[in-house]
Amino acid sequence: MEPEREGTERHPRKVRESRQAPNKLVGAAEAMKAGWDLEESQPEAKKARLSTILFTDNCEVTHDQLCELLKYAVLGKSNVPKPSWCQLFHQNHLNNVVVFVLQGMSQLHFYRFYLEFGCLRKAFRHKFRLPPPSSDFLADVVGLQTEQRAGDLPKTMEGPLPSNAKAAINLQDDPIIQKYGSKKVGLTRCLLTKEEMRTFHFPLQGFPDCENFLLTKCNGSIADNSPLFGLDCEMCLTSKGRELTRISLVAEGGCCVMDELVKPENKILDYLTSFSGITKKILNPVTTKLKDVQRQLKALLPPDAVLVGHSLDLDLRALKMIHPYVIDTSLLYVREQGRRFKLKFLAKVILGKDIQCPDRLGHDATEDARTILELARYFLKHGPKKIAELNLEALANHQEIQAAGQEPKNTAEVLQHPNTSVLECLDSVGQKLLFLTRETDAGELPSSRNCQTIKCLSNKEVLEQARVEIPLFPFSIVQFSFKAFSPVLTEEMNKRMRIKWTEISTVYAGPFSKNCNLRALKRLFKSFGPVQSMTFVLETRQPHLCIQYEVLEAAQLAIESLDGILVDGICIKVQRPVTELTLDCDTLVNELEGDSENQGSIYLSGVSETFKEQLLQEPRLFLGLEAVILPKDLKSGKQKKYCFLKFKSFGSAQQALNILTGKDWKLKGRHALTPRHLHAWLRGLPPESTRLPGLRVVPPPFEQEALQTLKLDHPKIAAWRWSRKIGKLYNSLCPGTLCLILLPGTKSTHGSLSGLGLMGIKEEEESAGPGLCS
């Protein structure tokens, strides 16, 4: 089973080497591993720095992964695992860590007011998407467990759970009772609704990231006597992310009907043996592929089958399959504040079973699948009231406190606790954390001997205190608070964002002769990149073409290459539609091209399926090449005819662009405009009908009214003011400071907004020099 979700003086650290992290670029070729190793061995590289590329699934970094990086920044590789999603070279040369949290802001804020966020986006080369926050974002990021969130950090607690634990509980306050009531429920009541499946990221038909997923074809009617099947999968880490290595399916009664090892399609970087139990020796002789187990699973499941799993969304995504009827025991046994009980814990306290024992090599997928099924049957048999009376929350808290037990005395002891928080890591090396926030903010860190909390009356006071206090602490968290978008304004801004990016990726071309060669024209415009649609406009005296491209780079390349040329003796104009959403598109394009994340990236159109191999055969021509990003068609899986190349520097990228668009390669290209995480976000927005390009839009009333009264606290003004203020504060930090800017996103009953993270090391890049926001 996969891992489940859930004093100011500085001490010198030992010199540590950096290790190669796996490349998880979606649709990318393997990065130049040898190049990294060579670079890492150079003696002159004595400054802490980050890898140029991030290894993230769907360009998203989870809160747990952020915590990985922060703990590694404190302790280094000798004491905690390296972060799985980025490389931090020369960690021992870091001087400070500073995290700025902009509560109330999201990725929508950043791209809706992209021009206003100029200081921050220019300073930080690394940007990544964050999932919507839980009710306690800060605690998630620093890795605090439940009992550490509300008050003082525990010191020690021994002995059994107090005898009055059950008597003290108010059953009506138990989240299980609040969701299911106190009476027994049938199987259908335990199924996740479609809305819940969407919320918890289950693969669903019609969603952009699931277009190549297979349906199980289980579409029969569901009743309380429908058959249950326990499912558990194990994964490994490949060059394309996590891939399936084992699947176990258990039918009611405990009979294992399927237990298969699976050979991943891509190169394996990490077998994740401690979780999966899979080793190279075990997997070497295996010939079964993902398509084989997909076929087998479809044949095994009856039309009314209900799949039961623990964090089942991860298993279905590994299988690349969509199933409509699911029970997830990590959600069935509801826990407070959106947290989840571990399978090992539920097995022990509900069933009296010991699973996932530390003396075994990895997890037993069949045992886990059988346990999951038993937990579902127990819930159905005994009902929510029986579960609530067990007081699982108190038992879990007591167990976690006992696990935390002895306060770490040194870093070796920290290693024994995988759930160690950033605070405990700092304490183990005798360091202290500064937490600056407003008095009215909900998110807090617990009081402890190594956490100095300073509460202020306003964002302005937080900023003033930060200037004074940050240099005194090795690790600082500075939290600002802003008013989140209302649900109505959020919906309007989402719609306008979708329309805006459609329109700036659309061009009108003409006039053309009435006898023009339409086939040749289509071929010409398609040569600049993937075309979403192409239509003739006949409203004008002479014909025009309207071309909507998939990517902004293709539209810009068409304008730059064709505007003003002669076609059949007629001078044509190639331009974007002019609406209030595209009036500043020239400024926006210039700013996107100058974005620090796009420095060193180029876009190419007309690449063949063998392009990557040809490219890698000419290493001397393309010095500094770090990644080849080859997008694939979601339906067919075929490589598209465009790509992005990422280089170490702008100069290397420019040299490569000159070569690749020259007479020998004959490709079309330009510098990149849109970073990967932006592509992923726009692709993931819910489908929405858009107006025809060129038609006038009446601004939605809420945003129109807000924009006409640009008050000091308006998001547009706030983005500009605080981007400059935080940018100036960043410029004042000492060299070698790891800095993260986190826009956590928002979560409410009306919907969720993804967050955004920006990351850099002070003076890591030239663009982060002084005067950036002066």
Swiss-Prot record:
This is RNA exonuclease 5. Residues 1-22 are annotated as: Disordered. Residues 228-376 form the Exonuclease domain. Residues 1-19 have a biased composition (Basic and acidic residues). Residues 505-579, 600-679 form the RRM domain. Keywords: Exonuclease, Hydrolase, Nuclease, Repeat, RNA-binding. One of its GO terms (cellular component) is extracellular exosome. Disulfide bonds: none annotated. Its EC number is 3.1.-.-. It comes from Homo sapiens. Transmembrane segments: none annotated. GO terms for molecular function: exonuclease activity; RNA binding.
